[in-house]
């Protein structure tokens, strides 16, 4: 499959992940405030080679198979610095995920990144439905879903790095997304 394009927003560059990003991911990812609401499959404590293993063994092979699309998040004002990651996944009930280094949170950057990849999901990949699971206590992620017109469709329990929490499933259809643009 064709390599994912670099995406641009007002303040961000979303560049497809590559093996060379491992060092920066290893520096910014393994922080409790980043990982606590992620799926329990994320190892914690995060191993010293966790980012390299993740890129080499999981992310890059799924990109090559056309099953997932992963981008590093970078500021246009500092394009050499990776500050987070946003991904699209071709999985049932799990189509978008992200993390952002703590010092960059609360500035609307993830809203920009999510908007760009959601547009890619609906317009380029021609998908009709986007579903996003999350730990219910992750209020910032919930607010992003609410602001972008997603609907809460299901609640159950899930295992996360920080433990067992109520889990929410949010969705938006392509038609709903287009009406809100």
Question: Which residue ranges define each predicted feature?
Answer:
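Conserved GNAT-fold acetyl-CoA-binding loop/helix
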Residues: 35-57, 71
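A generic secondary-structure signal
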Residues: 57-61, 120
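Soluble sensory domains of the PAS superfamily and closely related sensory modules
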Residues: 62-66
């Amino acid at each position: 499959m064709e390599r994912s394009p670099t995406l641009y927003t007002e303040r961000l560059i979303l560049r497809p992940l590559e093996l060379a990003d491992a060092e920066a991911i290893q520096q910014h990812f393994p922080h409790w405030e980043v990982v606590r609401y992620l799926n329990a499959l994320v190892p914690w404590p995060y191993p010293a080679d966790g980012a390299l293993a993740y890129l080499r063994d999981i992310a890059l092979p799924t990109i090559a198979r056309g099953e997932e699309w992963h981008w590093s998040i970078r500021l246009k004002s500092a394009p050499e610095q990776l500050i987070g990651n946003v991904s699209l996944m071709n999985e049932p009930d799990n189509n978008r995920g992200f993390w952002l280094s703590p010092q960059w949170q609360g500035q609307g950057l993830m809203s920009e990144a999510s908007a760009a990849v959601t547009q890619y999901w609906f317009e380029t990949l021609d998908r009709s439905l986007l579903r996003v699971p999350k730990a219910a206590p992750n209020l910032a992620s919930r607010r992003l879903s609410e602001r972008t017109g997603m609907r809460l469709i299901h609640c159950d329990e899930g295992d996360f790095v920080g433990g067992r929490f109520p889990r929410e499933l949010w969705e938006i259809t392509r038609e709903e997304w287009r009406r809100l643009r």
